Amino acid sequence: MEITFLGTSSGVPTRARNVSSVALRLPQRAEVWLFDCGEGTQHQLLRSDIKTSQLRRIFITHLHGDHIFGLMGLLASCGLAGNAQPVDLYGPPGLKDYIQACSKYSHTHFGNRVQVYTVEPGLVYEDEEFTVTCDLLKHRIPAFGYRIAEKDRTGRFDVEKAKSLGIPPGRIYGQLKKGETVTLTDGRVIRGQDLCGPTEAGRKFAYCTDTVFCETAIELAQGVDVLIHEATFAHQDAELAFDRLHSTSTMAAQVALAAGVNLLIMTHFSPRYAPGNPLDVTNLLQEARAIFPHTKLAYDFFNYEIPRHRSDHLVEVS
């Protein structure tokens, strides 16, 4: 699970930062999932080493232009390139109408390659490896935060140990590999987890933008490895944040602290903090770290690979 930031500016692009988009790379399944798709996202993809042919899902937080104006261009380009796999879109009410209107008036036709799903709080997507859930944040229009959770993986099955215990190969090995408990014909009870190496705990991250400080963000981010949270304003501009329902750097840090996350990565910075201005994003970083030290600043094309965690529980079986 590798995260790549394709756009980290709020509202409008700057010379150094494009508007919102984050890519989640899943190399084990040759897929890319996008979170938001602001104007110019496909150009950012071309400047990265991400393959658009692997684009499989796009999750939209809300319908403000800096989060969706890149959708149609990207989808159209995928169609022209002859991408084989479909692209599923998930987002708030109105997303499907937006896509249909753009398609109608631009005479762009996707056929069955693009499916749009309207989300509501709760489970958004699940397969054998991942679950994606969402909930409403606090913004001027309906905006959803997303939580992506990788399911735990059973550790490597110790075949030699199984043989030494006289467990016959076959279907029973498959059950033990899954961590199941089985009873042998001689009456012995064997726990699969005792024949497997350390469990690989599933990795988790949350994506919360746009929002002012809210309890929902804390709930979505509870215990995640990485929280990506907007930090549009500096603390001294908190009045603007409350007025426009955006977050300050200190609000993002407070969410991270309350949720007990491992790492906070701030993004969605106002252009007012561009280099050369009285305050820049390094000031926002200092403010956040005073509350939550494990904080990083996102920048365009910043990559972060979420590390795996293992829980040691290999037990000798007699």
Swiss-Prot record:
Enzyme class: hydrolase
Coiled-coil region list: none
One MF term in the entry's GO annotations: zinc ion binding
CDD domains (alphabetical): RNaseZ_ZiPD-like_MBL-fold
Cofactor(s), names only, from the UniProt record: Zn(2+)
E.C. no: 3.1.26.11
Catalytic activity: Endonucleolytic cleavage of RNA, removing extra 3' nucleotides from tRNA precursor, generating 3' termini of tRNAs. A 3'-hydroxy group is left at the tRNA terminus and a 5'-phosphoryl group is left at the trailer molecule
Keyword Glycoprotein found: no
Residue positions of the active site: D66
Cofactor notes: Binds 2 Zn(2+) ions.
Taxonomic superkingdom: Bacteria
Oligomer and partners: Homodimer.
Family: Belongs to the RNase Z family.
Function according to Swiss-Prot or TrEMBL: Zinc phosphodiesterase, which displays some tRNA 3'-processing endonuclease activity. Probably involved in tRNA maturation, by removing a 3'-trailer from precursor tRNA.
Name used for this protein in its record: Ribonuclease Z
Species for this entry: Gloeothece citriformis (strain PCC 7424)
